[in-house]
């Protein structure tokens, strides 16, 4: 990038606000939700036909919803970042707080609009996710319990956004939102020590939640339409990727170890979603979802995850 070009620097600053590696994980949420709904994507073995336009609308919607949420997070955090993270786009002056607020609001509105193109049910799910994102950014993230719960509900809602491609299947599969809720709750709770360090108690809580997620992924094998044999390799990959850094952070809750755990946890949302996708739609479809992992890793070399 040409650092002598102010317009390009400004564009780059707004891209940084979007946290592109994280947006890739949001796409994985929706793709997993589509698998849960049994939609007839190519290679998925799905039984419920869904228009490709609706699938594209839901994928675009999650980009808007997640992107809007993380941009507004920086807007609300601007005064704090001026002290703790002055290199971020807003406190450094590379992006204006007003411009970022407008950008984030437009992204959320676009996300809701995109979901509405799929179905009214999808639009309602998108409104829930958008409201949760704003609630988290403005208030909940400062609460030790409320913050992780709200963020987890947003992620769970994002999974259900994919399920809503078949509205009739949303209610019977709604409990699956507990998986991302628990895992993101683990990430969010431990992330509260990113700057000043955390506590072993928080680290142990995060490990307990991760253990519950792993156990639940295997317990889903009790469902007739969930093929545990297909999901198991992805569950193992998820465990290998996320457990070691969280154990290290729990043992020594220093800022750098917590940051490493959070980064690993965010990216591990992809193998988590791949496990769900493989269980409900077969290992080939699960592998397609997992293919987002190197994309997210590559983008994480260019953009911050947290």
Task: Name each model feature, range by range.
Residues 1-32:
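N-terminal, positively charged, Ser/Thr/Ala/Gly-biased leader segments
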Residues 2-10, 156-159, 164-306:
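C-terminal membrane-associated helical module and adjoining short loops/tails
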Residues 16-21, 90-100, 117-122, 143-146, ...:
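Short, amphipathic, aromatic/basic-enriched membrane-interface segments that mark the entry/exit
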Residues 34, 38, 74, 92, ...:
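Transmembrane helix-loop junction
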Residues 26-76, 84-85, 108-116, 120-136, ...:
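Membrane-embedded alpha-helical segments that form the functional core of polytopic membrane enzymes
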Residues 61-92, 97-99, 186-200, 299-304:
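Acidic (Asp/Glu-rich) catalytic motifs at the cytosolic membrane interface
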Residues 18, 77, 274:
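Divalent metal-coordination and catalytic microenvironments
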């Amino acid at each position: 990038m040409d650092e002598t070009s102010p317009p390009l620097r400004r564009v780059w600053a707004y891209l940084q606000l979007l946290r592109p590696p994280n947006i890739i994980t949001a796409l994985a949420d929706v793709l997993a939700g589509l698998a849960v709904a049994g939609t007839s994507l190519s290679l998925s073995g799905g039984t419920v036909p869904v228009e490709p336009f609706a699938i594209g609308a839901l994928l675009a919607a999650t980009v808007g919803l997640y992107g809007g949420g993380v941009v507004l997070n920086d807007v609300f955090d601007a005064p704090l970042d001026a002290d703790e993270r002055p290199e971020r786009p807003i406190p450094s002056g590379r992006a204006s707080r007003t411009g970022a607020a407008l950008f984030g609001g437009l992204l959320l509105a676009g996300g809701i609009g995109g979901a509405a193109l799929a179905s009214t049910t999808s639009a309602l799910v998108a409104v829930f996710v958008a409201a949760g994102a704003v609630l988290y950014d403005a208030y909940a993230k400062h609460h030790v319990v409320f913050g992780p719960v709200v963020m987890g509900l947003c992620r769970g809602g994002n999974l259900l956004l994919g399920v809503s491609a078949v509205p009739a299947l949303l209610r019977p599969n709604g409990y699956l939102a507990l998986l991302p809720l628990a895992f993101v709750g683990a990430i969010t709770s431990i992330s509260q020590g990113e700057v000043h360090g955390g506590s072993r108690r928080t680290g142990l809580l995060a490990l307990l939640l991760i253990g519950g997620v792993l156990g639940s992924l295997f317990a889903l094998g009790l469902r007739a339409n969930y093929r545990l044999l297909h999901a198991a390799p992805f569950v193992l990959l998820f465990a290998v990727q996320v457990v070691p850094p969280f154990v290290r952070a729990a043992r020594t809750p220093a800022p750098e170890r917590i940051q490493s755990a959070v980064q690993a946890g965010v990216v591990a949302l992809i193998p988590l979603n791949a496990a769900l996708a493989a269980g409900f739609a077969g290992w080939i479809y699960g592998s397609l979802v997992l293919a987002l992992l190197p994309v997210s890793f590559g983008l994480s070399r260019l953009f911050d995850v947290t």
